[in-house]
Amino acid sequence: MPKMKTKSSAKKRFKITASGKVKVAAAGKRHGMIKRSNKFIRDARGTMVLSDQDAKKVIQYYLPNGF
């Protein structure tokens, strides 16, 4: 059976840290920010780390080669 390919869309959205955690940008920031609270805008800045369960699934299905 051939080796699984990495999903190209996942390469652009997820980064795996040296310790094996998965970093991702916070969602909900494309438009409509005028009605959001300052706390939401501040908390959505930068990146966040996925939970262990979600990270396991992302690596297993979308990033099998560890991109």
From Swiss-Prot:
GO CC field: cytosolic large ribosomal subunit
PROSITE patterns linked: RIBOSOMAL_L35 (PS00936)
Keywords on record: Ribonucleoprotein, Ribosomal protein
GO biological process: translation
Tagged with keyword Ribonucleoprotein: yes
Keyword Nucleotidyltransferase among UniProt keywords: no
GO molecular function annotation: structural constituent of ribosome
Alphabetized Pfam families for the sequence: Ribosomal_L35p (PF01632)
Protein family: Belongs to the bacterial ribosomal protein bL35 family.
Stated name of the protein: Large ribosomal subunit protein bL35
Lineage: Bacteria, Pseudomonadati, Pseudomonadota, Alphaproteobacteria, Hyphomicrobiales
Gene transcribed to yield this protein: rpmI
